[in-house]
């Protein structure tokens, strides 16, 4: 169970960083 918790925390951390980069620097497709 500990491995599952650690993988969950790792995925959530990477997801937060990924979305923060996207929302900070949005793609310029519309522009």
UniProtKB/Swiss-Prot annotation:
Q: Which residues cross the membrane?
A: 3-23
| Gene Ontology BP term (one) | photosynthesis
Q: Which GO terms describe its cellular component?
A: cyanelle thylakoid membrane; photosystem II reaction center
- Quick one: signal sequence residues? none
On whether Protein biosynthesis is a keyword of this UniProt record, the answer is: no
Q: How does it sit in the membrane?
A: Single-pass membrane protein
**Subcellular location, record wording:** Plastid, Cyanelle thylakoid membrane
Secreted in keyword set: no
Q: Which Pfam families does the entry link to?
A: PsbT
Among SUPFAM superfamilies, the record links this protein to: Photosystem II reaction center protein T, PsbT
Ordered alphabetically, the record's keywords are: Cyanelle, Membrane, Photosynthesis, Photosystem II, Plastid, Thylakoid, Transmembrane, Transmembrane helix
InterPro entries for this protein: PSII_PsbT (IPR001743), PSII_PsbT_sf (IPR037268)
According to its UniProt entry, the function of this protein is described as: Found at the monomer-monomer interface of the photosystem II (PS II) dimer, plays a role in assembly and dimerization of PSII. PSII is a light-driven water plastoquinone oxidoreductase, using light energy to abstract electrons from H(2)O, generating a proton gradient subsequently used for ATP formation.
Q: PANTHER family under this entry?
A: PHOTOSYSTEM II REACTION CENTER PROTEIN T, PTHR36411
Outline the subunit composition. Answer: PSII is composed of 1 copy each of membrane proteins PsbA, PsbB, PsbC, PsbD, PsbE, PsbF, PsbH, PsbI, PsbJ, PsbK, PsbL, PsbM, PsbT, PsbX, PsbY, PsbZ, Psb30/Ycf12, at least 3 peripheral proteins of the oxygen-evolving complex and a large number of cofactors. It forms dimeric complexes.
Q: Write out the similarity annotation.
A: Belongs to the PsbT family.
- Please identify the protein, giving its name as recorded: Photosystem II reaction center protein T
Q: Which organism is it from?
A: Cyanophora paradoxa
